[in-house]
Amino acid sequence: MNRSTITRYLTRTFLVRVLSVLFALSALLQLLDLLDAASTVLERGLGGGGLVYYTMIRLPMVMERVVPLAVLIGSLSTLWTFASTNEIVAMRSVGMTPYQIMGALLPAALVISIAHFIMADQVAPRCERAFVSWWTATELPSEKKDDDPVKPVWFRLGDHVVRIASISDDGKHIEGVEMVTRDADGKATGLMSAVSGDHGPDGWQLSGVVQTEIGEPLRVTQSDKARWDVDLSPNNMIDLRKPPENIPFNRLLRIVRGNWAGGESPTYYATRLHSTYAAPLASLVMLLLAAPVAHGMRRRGGAMGSLALGTVIGLIFLLSSGILSSMGQAGALPPVMAVWSPLILFAAIGGAIMVYVEG
């Protein structure tokens, strides 16, 4: 048996195991979510078709979150099977080292990482937007709570700070507009307020505008109508009104560069931007953490220990990544450190364990 045949066999087995675990975990989580929402879907008169649509539109969002865990379990399962059936010994007998065995799985892990990036960056945000639109359109009048106060929206627009009391569902009508203008040093230079605003072919037109210029003397001007020259599209307003959980890479980049308004702090979006790069690479780290299972520890009676070690370290990696990312989004840690430190640290741990076991 030549190495190309072994490589194809390894790749096929690895991909089948990972995809099986991915679909199993996603189906379980989606089933739990569906059990919670099934009564609401049926009360809206959507029937069985509504249940199917609910499941399919939310499934990509669930799958995107469990890819690293599926790679960890799939890698451990694949290597454990090879070790328990002495296939690892057979591979080593034809001259393949454990490093070459793991290297044969690397292209498949890279394909999974690329697919994970596409799903998180393109598929999940579109599914979330479609789900929100469908869920809002089918909402019953009895489900709407008129007594709930409408929360104003705060966001940064360049150096300025904007507050909008309410935004319409289509993002083309706003009420209660206030904008504090600031200079490059962050010092307030004026205040603009308007009763309402509407978006048309020429941009935003404000009504009942009052502009205050801070200085000596204080200047206050009023006008019935005024054009609001800002780069705020109706889609941007919709995102501000209902912030999406899944944000595509291009949108995050525009927010960080100041070309798209966001309701969170700059560190939050910078952390999310770094996570867009780092999250798909977690699959490679998971494969590395599973490597000790393939390193002949079965001969020492430590196969179960290596399996448990890979599982525990992988779960700790996921937990620490989530905690540090939350700290980065809150501004407690620099975004680069919050996102990349667990990835680099656990990749180093996995590599060190692999070298130690082989040595």
Stretches with model-predicted labels:
Residues 1-158, 169, 217-220, 230-359:
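Transmembrane alpha-helices
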Residues 154, 204-205:
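Signature tryptophan residues that serve as conserved aromatic anchors
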Residues 163, 176-179, 205-208:
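Short hydrophobic/aromatic-rich beta-strand segments that constitute the beta-sheet cores
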Residues 164-165, 194-198:
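Extended lipid/amphipathic-ligand handling interfaces
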Residues 174, 192-194, 206-211, 223-225:
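Extended beta-sheet lipid-handling architectures
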Residues 180-184, 209-216:
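Short, solvent-exposed aromatic-acidic interface loops
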